[in-house]
């Protein structure tokens, strides 16, 4: 696997020098300063590429080129946004970047209720609390129809949870959910947020699938002409939330996506932390079945909590519910299969997220993206990979 690291650009508190010292060789980056939907010019791409390469690193993967909301709803200027997206892909390819991660999640990117969940060892992790989220939907946002998404027991627990919240806690929970996260342009007031949700009224899972298939059908000729691979990131969490449809959550969703848009340029990001939240997702089976379409991997683990099967926190990389041993073995099997047919390029892998720990507890960090937790995760995965390669792949 190619060892990569997500970098949020010049304003990231983790520097390129830090990243190189961590042992990564590839950078995962995006031009976050360009508004969603606007074309990334070659000038801007090359400027960022030069900054990365000046430190002896390679811009390996773009994560992400954001998909404008009007593309997802097929409203407004969606065709113009698609045309802009195509031009951005052309520009990236002509600048030597050939792998682009993206997602098709409506309104929100990855969603958590707690960005500073304290672990038993004192480190801090990201967490999704089903009851806290229900309290937000039912009693803070007051989304019409939200009751249908929760059991009576969950509704009662959510009311108790809400009644025990201070005003500061209400504001913090709201901010965690709707104010946007690193790499996301969106940040909403409650009223604006509900208005965004309302845009999806009447858009079912099947309809959103139609919109995604149309989007990809428009992009594939550009991707094929330039050898540029798209790698869709799964929904996070991988289930419907806020009354919104989700269409990249299960192996059945991947089956549909690869059958509907069969081009080899229509690929996947295997994010074990996202897919792994669902107990019914067999990650190794997913990798073995769709390995040839995996162009990017995010390796992290989550732990479902006993209090509620929908509640989870982000575990250490080799802990939690993800069987990282067999996941890495399956990825190495795919790399070997490719090598046997002449494709020796390693699959880019980044240690996704990481606990805030040690000296980073005293610093301002991007949620999930502090340096030391990811350094630990990368070192652990690197060691696991080396052991597997020497035991099973050295001839």
From Swiss-Prot:
Its cofactor is Fe(2+); Mn(2+). One of its GO terms (molecular function) is ferrous iron binding. Its EC number is 4.2.1.8. GO terms for biological process: D-glucuronate catabolic process. Gene3D superfamilies: Divalent-metal-dependent TIM barrel enzymes. Belongs to the mannonate dehydratase family. This is Mannonate dehydratase. The gene is uxuA.
